[in-house]
């Protein structure tokens, strides 16, 4: 991920990993039910958020510096950009594995799918 100048590399790695985990939850487990008035109908603990012991250890953050950018401190924000490609990549991998294209998230019939 291009960050311009890596001011705090450890923090950047944490942001990348956090964005990936957030998007994994969106793709695989998280459901945020609301009523017709947009009021949440589930308690926080029932939303399907990943717990720390459920996060795969294989997330590898690769920080790419691009010095000389004409921005404040030479740094570029990294927060949300890391979460954008993950859910579509997981959905495509699921399609390649099963041959079934799904159009709703979280994906169904996966080991992570919410239990009924």
Language-model regions: role of each:
Residues 1-116:
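C-terminal catalytic domains of large/alpha subunits in multi-subunit enzymes
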């Amino acid at each position: 991920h291009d960050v311009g100048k890596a001011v705090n590399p450890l923090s950047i790695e944490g942001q990348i990993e956090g964005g990936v985990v957030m998007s994994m939850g969106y793709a695989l487990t998280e459901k945020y039910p609301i009523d017709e008035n947009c009021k949440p109908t589930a308690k926080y603990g029932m939303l399907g958020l990943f717990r720390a012991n459920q996060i795969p250890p294989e997330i590898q953050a690769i920080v790419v510096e691009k010095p000389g950018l004409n921005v404040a401190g030479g740094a570029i924000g990294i927060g949300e950009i890391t979460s954008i490609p993950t859910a579509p990549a997981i959905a495509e991998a699921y399609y390649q594995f099963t041959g079934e294209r799904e159009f709703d998230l979280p994906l169904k019939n996966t080991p992570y799918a919410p239990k009924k």
